[in-house]
From Swiss-Prot:
Residues 149-158, 171-190 have a biased composition (Basic residues). Required for checkpoint mediated cell cycle arrest in response to inhibition of DNA replication or to DNA damage induced by UV irradiation. Adapter protein which binds to the checkpoint kinase chek1 and facilitates the phosphorylation and activation of this kinase by the ATR-TREX1/ATRIP kinase complex. Also associates with chromatin during S-phase, and this requires the pre-replication complex (pre-RC), cdc45 and cdk2. This may indicate a role for this protein as a sensor which monitors the integrity of DNA replication forks. Transmembrane segments: none annotated. The modification Phosphothreonine is found at T906. Residues 76-90, 136-148, 159-170, 913-925, 1240-1250 have a biased composition (Basic and acidic residues). The gene is clspn. It comes from Xenopus laevis. The lineage of its organism: Eukaryota, Metazoa, Chordata, Craniata, Vertebrata. This is Claspin. Residues 770-780 have a biased composition (Low complexity). The modification Phosphoserine is found at S864, S895, S934.
Amino acid sequence: MAALCEEEQVFLEPEDISLKIVETDSDSGQGSCEMADQNKLLGCVEDKDTDDEILVRKKSKKKEVLVDSDSDEELEMRNFADNVKGHSDNEENEETMSAYREKPRKIRSAVLDSDNSDHELDVQISTSQNAAEIPESEHDSLEKETHTVKPKTSKSLKKQTDTNKEEIVKNKSKRKIPKEKIKRRTKQKSKAVAEARPNLNDSGCLLTDGDLFDNGVENEMDSNEEEDSLEAIRAKMKSKLNSHSAENFEDFELDTEGNQESPEKRKERKAARLGKEAMKQMHSETQRLIRESSVSLPYHLPEPKTIHDFFKRRPRPLCQGNAMQLIKSTKYQPCTEEKKKPNEEICAEVPEFDYVSKEDLEISPEQPLLNTQCSHAAVLCVVQNDARTEGLSKSTEAVVTGQMNDHEDAFSDSNIVHEQETVGLITVTETFQTPFIPQPESVVCEQIQNDVVEMQRMPEQPTHKPKLSKLEKLKALGVDLSIKPRLCPDDGSFVNLDEPKPNKEFEALKERFLKHTLQKSKPRTERKVNLNIIRKETTADGKEELKADVVPIVMATEKPDKSIYQKPGEKLQVLKVKLQEAMKIRRSEERLKRQALYKLDNEDGFEDDEEEEEMTEESEDDGDGNAETADYPGGEDEEEVGDAEDDNDEDDTVNDRLLGNVPEIVIPLPRPVTTDSSLMLFKDNSSKLGDSLPDESGCKRSSRLEYEEDSLLPQLKENSHNSSFELISSMIPSYQPCNKTTRVVINSNNLGFRSPSPVHFKTSFLSSASKSSGKMSEPSLPVEDSQDLYNASPEPKASYLCAGRNSQFQFSLEDDTQSQLLDADGFLNVGRHKSSSAKHRLALDTMDENAMDANMDELLDLCSGQFKESLSGTSQAAESDAKKQPMDELLELCSGKFVSQADCSTQDSSASAKDRSTAVKKDISDEVATVSSSFLTEREQEEDEEEEFGEFKLLPCDDSESENEEQNEEEEEEEDAKDDEDEEEILQKQQKRKLRLNDFMEDEAELSGSDVGSGDEYEGDDDEYEEEAIDEDLPSDEELQDQVNKIHMKVTMDEDQRQLRFYQERYLADGDLHSDGPGRTRKFRWKHLDDASQVDMFRRDSELEEVDGENEETEETELKWRKERFEREQWLREQPQGSRDNNEEEEEDIGEDSQFMKLAKKVTAKALQRKVSTETNEPKKPGPRNPYEVIRPFSLPKLRTGSLLSKPKEVLQKLAAVSDLNPNAPRNSRNFVFQTVSPGKKEETTDKPRSKVRKNIAVAMPSPKRFKRDSTPTVKSRSIFQLLE
């Protein structure tokens, strides 16, 4: 029983109180302790690492009463005094107890159950088990008390004896005074301890509103204690203890070891268990009410982080050692505390946390263990169970005195873990070896009072932690600071203090990179340039000489270009913007010029003036948009060239040089003859119906045209439109089908149509010489340009090359690429060829041979329709191949006729006839639509006549006579032009609007008769033109001959083909030469069809008929013939051995008058006679007739295929009988020798030999891939090839 007494006296250590863990049997989770500091948590981990301590955990056998009222506490103090007094009377047991006390014990305060409320924790005590000798009766009474102290539990207590009551009353006055003092001090210290410990809740979190939990539990506990009448319970307990006081002390150890064997105690334990369950139920109900109540709990609000916090590196500890040592180290914890301060500040803002201060939650890690203990609990709180016996007063006094001494010695003898911090459950190893000295009760009380006063006077150490320097932190982390870094090599290595060798390639790469990235245009400073010039000097003799001279020129400083392009491609974009702006300016200027010309053209009054003006504006807008698309790519090409140059000015100088090197050529160009589809939009479209007459003066150009051309040249130089792309897009004609040949004047005597003014152009400027339709002139309708964009394959017309002001069109349309530079004979079109046809030599006034070759290279490619990429618009683009070709080849290509120079004059008439015949079938509108020329008045032609001869001219020969002849011809043309001018102007004005509308029409308009002229047209002098138009419509005799020959040949070929097929059908079997379709066409016959059904014969060659495209009459005749043939074959089957005379009569019906047929009949008759005689001589067994077999008299021996559908029924029945399965036979009979045969089938076997059966099987089942022919054909073959052998 002594062990029980020792456990009942519990020494309350202040740190144990602050961190007591209550074990709860319920699932509420209450009792989990919250640490105010993370150091305490880590300390718990480190406690387990120490080897000096052995954690002994004993489940307490006692349940302590809640100290709620004053009466309870008075009763406890009285029992305490009785124990002290009784202890002093029993001094004979000192030796036994001192021996028991001298055993060293390591005690950890027992972890109590959570049956009691939180207030029970405040009075919980951990004790050092040091007890004096106690009589056996006292131990028995204490043992019984341990199990009966619980409120609501002990219902089976014995009645109290009268002696016990008297003793209690007698000792009341003695105990009262000292115990009241102890009670007050205990209350004060328990309050201080309660403030220092962390509050517990049922979820393991810090319950800051402690009143909510404590008050609820305490109120329920108070009410329960009032109901159960605590005073009555205490009286029962005391009576029970007194009844057992007389038992012997000798049985102390036995009772201590076997205290669970007594039946009385078992009954009391049953009652205690019931009380414990009732406390559990009450506690769980309390926890349920608390859980269901609405509490505003402050949740953890993390500090909002900025984006910079996420990119910061985590601070890594710069120390040695593994990670666990860093985590356990004391110096590593302040950084974690600093992180938690903001969160605690947030929690402090909530008003429910006001009474929980930060100092209460934190304990300074540097505060010594003794001071912390003294500051929190100054006195030893000795709490015993409520029921005490009177006889224990003396022994209890000795116990208290021994405990005080042992407690004072404990701080000197115990091993304290983590001296600089207080963490977790602090386990103190106490060795009680001091001798037991009994002291009177007054001494004990005085010592307790003095200890309380001293501990209250001791000042609390400040909680602020002094800042440590980096060196101290490193020392605390275990870094050896005595080692200093040095520049020394390790073992086996060396330190190279020399500078590394420079990497030349890397440096060059950096320089190159910097050169490209940091390139700056250097401003050109003032400098001197030597300019080579040529001066004329007159000598003393009066002769002029050319002398070369050098003139120094001082170039001024150039300002650097301010626009420094930083981005790639920026310069190109800027150039594009500049180009577009220049194009807008140029289009606006040209629009103004066209408007002025239009007004001048329509001054003499046109009926539909306003309407025509609107249409013109629309067409101009569309034409401009299309011209922009045509010009723009050329600009891009030049911009790429400009990127390679330093400045844009250099581009202009290069173009100036190119243009300066090439002399200017004046080529008189053919002009188009106006049809209904030609364009009469503007004044300069001066294609006239009277141009067929050689009357107009050649080689004239107006001042207005010169002005336009001169104003256009610098812009074109600036924008550099000399690209092949623009040449193709602007000069390739759009296909405008308008097959109309109305009122076209063609004079057969004149092969070429003369023009009043030849086009003046430069060859290097050739590609940019057309804006929308060969722009030296104004653009025409939008159809010309817009169709270039979406026409998939436009026909390349070389006539666009020369589209100029007053151009001439050659009607030799035999070749699509007919050149307008050349006439029908293939020579350059310069004037008329009547007198100079014998002299065909090219002469240029001041052009050397190289320049001529360069120009002819372009002309050769353009006229022949070969638009290659080498055509870049400059004269140097294509020089390699064409220089080697002779001029004759050029002329032949351009004219489209490969003739020699000697035959040129003799072929004029045939060429004109060809021209007339092909002009009917060809389309003229393409060439006419793209050639726009300016209409010149008579005065303007006369004014500019003199200026035109100042330019270079293409002359037919070098002789002066040819020049004189050409001048005479031009004068004649002038006179003729004056006569016809008035008439042509009237015709032109009246046809303008109609021609413009026709351009927008398509080919379908011809079907509706829209090509017929309206009745209100001008009909004056139309008879002459209509007659000539009628003549033009007629083809030539040669063409008529060709057409008739073609038709005749087609008819005769069809007839021959039909006749040939007829003979093939008659005399050849299907396998012979004329198998038009696939040679192995299988024709299947169905089972139950008639044997005479030959439906497939009638349409066997239908595919061939469709391919050949024969007419219906031929099909009808062939169908009739096939019917006759079928009937004939059917009759032959009925009479297989009929006379040959019948067949001969049938053959005579067809082609009796043919000698070939007569000969064939004789030969076949002889051959058949021989074969019949041989067949009759050979004895033959007539086999079973195949009902499916068709006897064809004209077929080869029958081809047997592997199809079972073509077999007769008898063969199929035999095959079915042979293929019957034997059920008794083994399944894998491939390599099986013996086979069971049913006897019934042996009897049914016929007398036919087996060889015949095998033969039939072999015949019936041939290889499906090959044909097997019978050795003896059953059908008479009448193939003609057998007879001809």
